[in-house]
Amino acid sequence: MKINVYTLNSFAKTKEGGNPAGVVMNADSLSEEEMRKIAAVLGFSETAFVLQSNKADVKVRFFTPDEEVDLCGHATIAAFYAMSSLNLLKQGKYEQETRAGILGIEIHNDNFVMMDQSMPVFSEVIDKDEIADSLNISTSQITSDLLVQVVSTGLRDIMVPVRSMEMLDAIRPDMKKVKEISRKYNAVGYHVFSLESLHGANAYCRNFAPSYGIPEESATGTSSGALGCYLYHYGKINEEQASHIIFEQGYSMKKPSEIRVSLAIRENRIIEVKVGGKAMNLTAAEVEI
């Protein structure tokens, strides 16, 4: 069985950068097992399958090589960038149906895609010693004035602040322990960050999600939304900065990526979360399953 697919790099800062994703259009006739097989053959951290929806403009399902996930930021960017580039969608506002709910999408004039996230949920605060041990670092390398905490804007991630970019680049995690702790807290993985950056961004990040078959990811949309909310919540980003937050990721993998986050604030409360970016290298291909 041959399937037409598109591949592209979401959140790319350069042509080498970004997070690769697969996109399959008109996927209504595919079974869940066929979708999983296609995702496994492509081998990207996520592949998006675009289907018809009776609740929104489109329905999108997301598969890692191992399983289906509720939502994926970079594969959403990939899917809507591809639909826009192929003239299937024009500039404007759309709704996508996902397992995480119905979420708004905006396509801007340069195929720049912004997507709505759920309102932030701040959950468990985690012992720093436990996290440091799993990352093979000392507890003193974790920022003292910020918490290690599970935060979600659609998917639960563990926010881990470290003191410097240099320390962050040097981290070599114990993936078995990261996997165990992620599962213990029902989180996708760790979003580890430093408030230092290379090019004036608000933070420099690395993301580890071995429990989903992703040892490290070069650009993570949903975690970026959660991080933007976390930094505002703990006073590291003010209301003026909140509408234009930039995160760097993927540099340690030689895949430079830039993720934008926009928070709308009213009376010191977050009332809207958007995450977005560009994609590059749209290519048509065929896979056999």
Put a short name on every predicted segment.
Residues 1-71, 77-289:
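Active-site proximal loop and beta-alpha junction motif in alpha/beta enzyme cores
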